[in-house]
Amino acid sequence: MAALRLGDKAPNFTAQTTEGEIDFHNWLGDQWGILFSHPADYTPVCTTELGTVAKYTDEFNKRNVKVAALSVDGVASHHGWIKDINETQNTTVNFPIIGDEDRKVSELYDMIHPNADSQLTVRSVFVIGPDKKIKLTITYPASTGRNFDELLRVIDSLQLTAYHKVATPANWNSGDDCVIVPSVSNEQIPELFPKGHKEIKPYLRMTPQPN
């Protein structure tokens, strides 16, 4: 199928997970979501990734984000591997891992890239908004573990810009100044941005983070 693009509706599915069967859209409810795939259970990089996700539970909860992982391994394999993750990463996995043995979800989300590996999922990441639309996609090669601090940073930006007429500049972190979007006129700025602003160029106007 065609690759999913930003703004597309995240396809719904039902699947067996380590926490029972889920209907993806119902499971998300009105929260933000991250769906990410890993190549295989009992592999080193994936073990560190899922351990990190578990350690970041409080950070995801603060942002109202639900997380689900996926590979083409079965749920029984996931349960065995979770014991290793908990032991080696000093954590407790507390999110569902989807068993996608029939590759239904992997194909729905274009997570298998034949020129990389014809059988296993790549390291895909999908951030999904409360409207069930895709807000971010990132694909990593099997050799590179994901940076979950960066994913939190992007979620901070997505949630900020969903409710305020700003964008976030390069290397922005929560608390840094933001860019006022071009659609905002200078006349609107005092009402929308009472903290003030600095005009560097007519198209480049900065303001303290509004939230």
For each predicted feature, which ranges?
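Chalcogenol-based redox active-site neighborhoods
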Residues: 1-211
